[in-house]
From Swiss-Prot:
One of its GO terms (molecular function) is translation regulator activity. It is found in: Cytoplasm, Cytosol; Periplasm. This is Secretion monitor. One of its GO terms (cellular component) is periplasmic space. It comes from the Bacteria. Keywords: Cytoplasm, Periplasm, Signal. The keyword Metal-binding does not apply. Disulfide bonds: none annotated. Regulates secA expression by translational coupling of the secM secA operon. Translational pausing at a specific Pro residue 5 residues before the end of the protein may allow disruption of a mRNA repressor helix that normally suppresses secA translation initiation. It comes from Pectobacterium carotovorum subsp. carotovorum (strain PC1). Residues 1-36 form the signal peptide.
């Protein structure tokens, strides 16, 4: 009985949890939709240079770059488990980039741009600063920066909407 439990634990540690984390990162980045919408790389004509294949990979990954730069939600930030999943994917991809010597150079060149762009995007997700909301005041015509203004609803109403309750001067 103990042997069965130990084997199940080893299976979970080696196979189940890494694949679950990879799936979480892929689902959060939208990888299945962005890569399935592009042409199949193997259906491209085989040329002496892999320029056409590299162009196709870079075109299919433009959605990832746009997703990285997009402002999804004002309170969007990567939480601990998301960071853990992204770090696991980066680790798996970095091990996958170290190709064995038996693989020829052309196959390694075809896989490298896709993996490098994906690593760069995941690293940017980990190192990005959380984006705070910027409010443009219609009266003053200037951009006002509010760091963590979630608990300052009264101040926001007073400055932006002109609704005031309490003293006219904030000390």
């Amino acid at each position: 009985m103990i042997g069965i439990l130990n084997r199940w634990r080893q299976f979970g540690r080696r196979y189940f949890w890494p694949h679950l984390l990879l799936g979480m990162v892929a689902a959060s980045l939208g990888l299945p939709t962005s890569l399935n919408d592009s042409q199949d790389i193997t259906s491209l004509p085989n040329s002496s240079s892999s320029v056409s294949r590299q162009n196709n990979v870079s075109l299919s990954l433009t959605d990832l770059v746009a997703l990285k730069e997009a402002h999804r939600r004002s309170s969007y930030s990567v939480d601990y488990w998301h960071q853990h999943a992204i770090r696991t994917v980066i680790r798996h991809l970095s091990f996958a980039l170290t190709t064995p010597q038996t693989v020829n150079a052309q196959q390694a060149d075809e896989l490298e741009p896709h993996s490098l762009v994906l690593l760069d995007t995941l690293n940017a997700l980990l190192t990005q600063d959380s984006q705070y909301p910027l409010v443009i005041s219609p009266r003053a015509g200037r951009v006002t920066f509010y760091p963590q203004a979630h608990h300052q609803v009264g101040i926001w109403l007073a400055q932006i909407r002109g609704i005031r309750a309490g003293p006219s001067l904030l000390s």
